[in-house]
Amino acid sequence: MSHEGQEELLDYSDSEEIAVPTTTEVAGADSATDKEADKKGSYVGIHATGFRDFLLKPELLRAIGDCGFEHPSEVQQVCIPQSILGTDVLCQAKSGLGKTAVFVLSTLQQLDPVPGEISTLVICHTRELAYQIRNEYARFSKYMPDVKTEVFYGGTPIKRDIEKLKSKDTCPHIVVATPGRLHALVNEKAIRLSNVKSFVIDECDKVLESIDMRRDVQDIFRATPHQKQVMMFSATLSQEIRPVCKKFMQNPLEIYVDDEAKLTLHGLQQYYIKLEEKEKNRKLSDLLDSLEFNQVIIFVKSTQRANELNKLLCSCNFPSIAVHSGLPQEERIERYRSFKEFNKRICVSTDVFGRGIDIERINLAINYDLPNEADQYLHRVGRAGRFGTKGLAISLVGSKEDEEVLEKIQSRFDVKITEFPEEGVDPSTYMNT
């Protein structure tokens, strides 16, 4: 459904975008009460539809049932009916509303696996996210035994990828990859993309804002057929990047589930604690001692600080695990898997865990160091309170710069972040019963 990418995507003319009314907006139009509920981020009117109403394959419905999902989220209800028809989709929706399931389910619904043919291509900007998306495909295709999915990313031997792609027996129908590795495979003529029917970019703003990644994506895009479905998703999608995304598409369905002023997280309590830099370790120890949580992720600004804080926590009898870009690739994946499997309850991380990574048990996010950008705050704290569940986010504010970032966050997302109360927080307000 898309035309070939242009050589220079920066040369575009702005076109008017029409935000598609979401189900919540329609439901909220019925009464003042509904409008007020919608303002607070509630799920007004979205449970009227079940996954069965989408007329999905029985194998998909069975897998969805095994996952315990009964009703689609807001973004799923709006997107899936169009995406399974092959419509190009540009979707921005806040963290935790199941955007990944939209393209996983719609591509599996349309997939008719042919040995040796790649039908679906999914591009994302980090290896961890690629690994996670692959797992989502495995989860929803469990009753589709003929479907093969592979993940390709840098930091691993490319020869292994080439060997998998050579044989009809091992060549996947679905490829999830980072731009650099996929571009290398295209250059090596090791991957055949002439049968691609679905072209997906997850966290598309992050991929296309980087000039290097964008060039890689353009080259990859040109290696795919003229006629195909293109879908792009992100939690944040600025007005500037939207036209760039649309250059890859033909008449896309544009879905902005929440406008930019309301990109807050339903069910997530957000607080800050003002203190000196030297007081952070003591305060963090107090929080971990006093707060109830399933799993916690602690964000720091550098790999060095991640290692140092992880070492300190372990020495203070807080068994933790550190995940950051300074680790060898296999080790990063192994630590990510270990944390996801609940072998450790505390994870110290840089922003490598700040986007798209989904670990359902996390219900506490602590910004030991605040991010430099307001948008990154959303992706970080979005690790807690996924899928509309409760969660708690606490930011340690230790400098004038931190105070400025906090102001930007509150202004950007139209949210009031209050000071953490001295008496603490009632666990029932952020722990799911």
Curated annotation (Swiss-Prot):
Main function: ATP-binding RNA helicase involved in transcription elongation and required for the export of mRNA out of the nucleus. SUB2 also plays a role in pre-mRNA splicing and spliceosome assembly. May be involved in rDNA and telomeric silencing, and maintenance of genome integrity.
EC code: 3.6.4.13
SMART domains: DEXDc (SM00487), HELICc (SM00490)
GO MF annotation: an example: ATP hydrolysis activity
GO biological process: mRNA 3'-end processing; mRNA export from nucleus; mRNA splicing, via spliceosome; subtelomeric heterochromatin formation; transcription elongation by RNA polymerase II; transcription-coupled nucleotide-excision repair
Organism annotation: Scheffersomyces stipitis (strain ATCC 58785 / CBS 6054 / NBRC 10063 / NRRL Y-11545)
Name of the molecule in the record: ATP-dependent RNA helicase SUB2
Keywords, ordered alphabetically: ATP-binding, Helicase, Hydrolase, mRNA processing, mRNA splicing, mRNA transport, Nucleotide-binding, Nucleus, RNA-binding, Spliceosome, Transport
Major localization class: nucleus
Residue ranges of the motif DEAD box: 202-205
Protein family per UniProt: Belongs to the DEAD box helicase family. DECD subfamily.
Chain residues that bind ATP: A93, K94, S95, G96, L97, G98, K99, T100
Location in or out of the cell: Nucleus
